[in-house]
Amino acid sequence: YINYKNMSHQHLLTLFNLLPVGANISTWWNFGSMLLSCLMIQIATGFFLAIHYTANINMAFSSIVHISRDVPYGWIMQNTHAIGASLFFICIYIHIARGIYYGSYLNKEVWLSGTTLLIILMATAFFGYVLPWGQMSFWAATVITNLLTAIPYLGTTLTTWLWGGFAINDPTLTRFFALHFILPFAIISLSSLHILLLHNEGSNNPLGTNSDID
């Protein structure tokens, strides 16, 4: 039971927890807002990491070590950004699973914008994974970008353009850093559209009850 008369005297966190929400939705509806929180954390930590990062194949790994060892609270920024990315994907897969289970895909505009968001997010994560330029980064960059060569006629040209040459080298890392930096802004824009489209029709109603049943 929520005593609405006393809500004005409660702490902000308590007010947030007591936010009146219809009984016809559950905890599974929290993950959209959790994703926005993850996005804000990633952009904030990513900005401070980008200040100290060097997009050069000879210095990239050393710059990551420098961030972790020498930059004040750099180790927190680096770990939060890395672990936050994993949390981001956990939240988004639960968010998608809820949508599939409850039939949110019937709201086509919201679903298509969300699918596009997932593709951009996966691309952003891939570019970020390459940036430390360790052994696994180099392997990932080589294997994943080589998939472009499977595209008929244009594949080899696209791969050469993405690499900035005939092999993965310094221009590749520079391009990946630029893409990793710019794509989150595309995610912000598309997330805004995703939310606007959602509130245009409203979320689905899993129990089939009246929205104002409470």
Curated annotation (Swiss-Prot):
Residue sites binding heme b b566 per the record: 95, 194
Pfam families linked to this entry: Cytochrome_B
Membrane topology term: Multi-pass membrane protein
Cofactor entry: heme b
Subcellular locations according to the entry: Mitochondrion inner membrane
InterPro entries per UniProt: Cyt_b/b6_N, Cytb/b6-like_sf, Cytochrome_b_N_euk/bac, Di-haem_cyt_TM
GO cellular component terms given for this protein: mitochondrial inner membrane
Domain of life: Eukaryota
Record note on cofactor: Binds 2 heme b groups non-covalently.
One GO term of the biological process aspect: mitochondrial electron transport, ubiquinol to cytochrome c
Keyword line: Electron transport, Heme, Iron, Membrane, Metal-binding, Mitochondrion, Mitochondrion inner membrane, Respiratory chain, Transmembrane, Transmembrane helix, Transport, Ubiquinone
UniProt cross-references to PROSITE patterns, sorted A to Z: CYTB_NTER
Annotated residues for binding of heme b b562: 81, 180
Keyword RNA-binding in annotation: no
TM annotation in the entry: 31-51, 75-96, 111-131, 176-196
Primary localisation category: mitochondrion
Binding site for a ubiquinone: 199
One GO molecular-function entry: metal ion binding
Family classification: Belongs to the cytochrome b family.
Biological role stated in the UniProt entry: Component of the ubiquinol-cytochrome c reductase complex (complex III or cytochrome b-c1 complex) that is part of the mitochondrial respiratory chain. The b-c1 complex mediates electron transfer from ubiquinol to cytochrome c. Contributes to the generation of a proton gradient across the mitochondrial membrane that is then used for ATP synthesis.
Misc note: Heme 1 (or BL or b562) is low-potential and absorbs at about 562 nm, and heme 2 (or BH or b566) is high-potential and absorbs at about 566 nm.
Quaternary structure, from the entry: The cytochrome bc1 complex contains 3 respiratory subunits (MT-CYB, CYC1 and UQCRFS1), 2 core proteins (UQCRC1 and UQCRC2) and probably 6 low-molecular weight proteins.
Protein name listed in UniProt: Cytochrome b
Gene name as annotated: MT-CYB
